[in-house]
């Protein structure tokens, strides 16, 4: 029982179904670990332990009565960007430090319906703006592999909680790499689905045309289990798209069952030289190329493709995302909800002080740059031009996929750096250089672990797919994980028993 947290989601499901342990015992095991060890990591903002224990007892009773839902009684946790009725929902910001959501986000409702048990809300970069989880009002999150290092961001709390063995899976959101980059830094698998695949209703907006929710776990199969209840059309989200509903878990099982000695025979993996250029750490490049060689040994064909220069993509993203943020975050004014300054002199003072005191430096920086890009005289020169470049980025991906089935790249140019090391915003922004193009194009992508640095820090490989091809991405990673053990390595904190 002391190592329940090291089991995969499939093993947890089997254990619950075979009565090897109860949902209450499993939930208590995770709660005990969180209480004992999260002081080192700071992955949770809000704990919902008592509610979780009540839900676990109910799940055990429902299983006795014949409830066959596979995820019934399996614990998880939500990134604190998803509204949760009756529970503090902060988005990592002082602006929302007292906000109790009056409703559930659609994915929260869907995961509840699947029978999963939420252990709480997870730390994150403030309003999802950051790549290291150091901008949270609730303090920095520490990487479970080495607590002196960052876990990545903005879903750093989600990644750290899974890597530490506090939950088997967690939700995240990805605007420019916020699932994939922390998955890479924490040795996890994390997937950002096609834009429109998962409802954004109840997910606090950063950049509406880029935001997408996804799942994080140690393996592709873990991600598939959590992603399954998250997907589906939602009429309350205008960007939600009606499309075929795949069974990800079945797709992965079918792929494994039909795989021979060369499971990737016929698979064309595109590799762009633009992803292996200046700024890429030597150890990261070596691990990525070794993973590609393994894919090749297992039957895949590596083909060279061309995509938009990542530096152009980076500039485009940091023009469009802050512009959308400046609009989305204008609702936080100290009047309707959120932080309100004390004793304002007048209405203008209320607005000014509430926002300057309620938002942290990184959020203010992006609001200001976005407002500048949208201002009269600069709109056409910056915002409109960036939207035109976005179309070129999409076209370049379309052209690349004419010659390959998936595109592979390093997830991030480096492994996790030390806390406080990357204080220069421009340097931090470069950490997203390989991931943001996917969001601009609305494509699905995942990160999978492919090795460790000499310092013992995880390295991730990104796989990018065509629209609606999450099953192909997950199956590709799953089959790779059948022949490697990178996803089976555990962090320093996960190895600790309590």
Swiss-Prot record:
Catalytic activity: L-glutamyl-tRNA(Gln) + L-glutamine + ATP + H2O = L-glutaminyl-tRNA(Gln) + L-glutamate + ADP + phosphate + H(+)
InterPro entries named among the record's database cross-references: Amidase, Amidase_CS, Amidase_dom, AS_sf, GatA
One Gene Ontology term of the molecular function aspect: glutaminyl-tRNA synthase (glutamine-hydrolyzing) activity
Keyword Cytoplasm: no
Single biological process term from Gene Ontology: translation
Keywords: ATP-binding, Ligase, Nucleotide-binding, Protein biosynthesis
Superkingdom of the source species: Bacteria
Pfam families xrefs: Amidase
NCBIfam families the record matches: gatA
Protein family per UniProt: Belongs to the amidase family. GatA subfamily.
UniProt name for this protein: Glutamyl-tRNA(Gln) amidotransferase subunit A
Species annotation: Psychrobacter cryohalolentis (strain ATCC BAA-1226 / DSM 17306 / VKM B-2378 / K5)
